[in-house]
Structures are given as C-alpha cells and as structure tokens.
C-alpha cells in the first residue's frame, strides 16, 4: 500500500512526512513488514495496549526495526513490560485475531485508508503523521482539556 501511494521513493516520502510533523524517522526496512502479529500482541497487553503499540510504532518508524519478525515482537513486548511466555503464546496461535479484524473493519468504516491513523472518541479520524498541535485542536474541539505537560 505504501509503495502504491508514494511510488518507488517511498522511503523519502515517509521521511519527509515525519520531518514535517517534527517526528523522528529511521531508515525503514527494505520490505514493509506485516504488523498483524505485533498488533495481536499489543491487543493482548490490555491496559498496556497504548504503551506497547507506541513501542512497535517507534521500533519501526523511529529505529527501522522489522516489526513483522517474531524476535523483534518479543523483544519490544518484554521491554514494554509483558512476559516472554505470554507473548510467545499469542504468537503461537490466532489469539486476538478476531479483535484485530473487527477493529480494522471499524477503522475502515470510519475512513482510515492506511497507517498511521488515529480514531479519537470512537469517530474522529486523524490520518497520517501529524504534529502534536493537531491532536490538541481535535481534543479541544471534542471538549477535552489537553494535559498541561503536552
């Protein structure tokens, strides 16, 4: 999908998008990894979902790691506070696949066409890498008060 959207110079386009948003970007792996397995592990993390999802995003976009590789998935999950045995248990089967597919369908119905994309308050879509201020404006319009520390 990224190659179709950005053409053969995808790496430069993604880096430019991140630079414009003020986000760090690493050289991405030569092949776009299938992140489904990492996403299932993140879902399994329960209350730590956001923290683990962020770790996987930072690992891929910020450090150029292959988040489709089981060992990378396990290392990042352990660093995010999960235990190795439970992570390998998720990877050994199809646990949480139904949740992932359901959430993916919901995102598509909301208008998401790629990653990164955020759905806020169950319906407001923020597509692409965006500066922090965009999220602040969206939250304010939805009646939320952004945290003082940003």
Show which residues each predicted segment covers.
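C-terminal cap of thioredoxin/glutaredoxin-like
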Residues: 47, 51, 55-150
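Structural alpha/beta surface segment adjacent to cysteine/selenocysteine redox centers
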Residues: 1-63, 145
